[in-house]
Regions:
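Active-site-adjacent loop/helix segments that line or gate small-molecule/cofactor pockets in enzymes
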Residues: 2-43, 93
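PLP-dependent aspartate aminotransferase-fold enzymes
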Residues: 103-193
Length: 193
């Protein structure tokens, strides 16, 4: 059975294998996938694939779903916001809820110094901005990153990533002044001394 929506055919009874074959034809190879299953729905800490198999979600959107999938309070808040407006680029259109959340986070941050918040759309964007802020504040260009760490897919964050395969092969040269060091784990014989 199929359903057509503006020229795109959607298979209502597709299998994971069928969808992965379509993925191979339509999606760039640079987008890696850890699993070959396609999620159809999710609730709390469980996901169901398109074949109806249930799984426990140990990935949680790589750490961004600490409330679980489809939490009722999150759904209600999103629905309320969507009814008001959906534009989210604060640099173009200002809105009070951005400031309210920044104030709440600033109040939670430790220490007596003045706090300010910057919201970004991805981890890579956050890392790149942290590097820019640190370089501007210190006047020093050097950055230390730990071996084995993963920081993102932009050129700067790939340079910081401490694992060559599969992330960095064929993408250099990377930005300069990035130095890699082993992460201090005493059980591995590496200490902070």
């Amino acid at each position: 059975m199929t359903e057509t929506n503006k020229g795109v055919e959607r298979h209502l009874l597709a299998s994971n294998a069928d969808l992965f074959a379509r993925r191979e034809q339509a999606v760039a190879r640079g987008v890696g996938n850890m699993h070959k299953l396609f999620v159809e729905r999710a609730r709390n800490a469980e996901v169901w694939d398109v074949e109806g198999k249930r799984y426990i979600d140990f990935a949680g959107g790589i750490g961004v779903l600490n409330t679980g999938h489809c939490h009722p309070k999150i759904l209600a808040a999103v629905e309320e916001q969507m009814r008001r407006f959906t534009h989210t680029c604060f640099q173009v259109v200002l809105y009070e809820s951005y400031i309210e959340l920044a104030e709440r986070l600033n109040a939670l941050a430790p220490g007596d110094a003045t706090k300010k918040t910057l919201f970004l759309t991805s981890g890579a964007e956050a890392v790149e901005n942290a590097i820019k802020i640190a370089r501007a504040y210190t006047g020093r260009p050097g950055v230390i990153a730990f071996n084995g760490g993963y920081h993102g897919r932009t050129l700067m964050t790939l340079g910081l990533t401490g694992k060559v395969a599969p992330y960095k092969i064929g993408f250099g040269p990377f930005p300069g002044e990035i130095y890699h060091a082993p992460f201090p784990i005493e059980v591995h014989g590496i200490t902070v001394e």
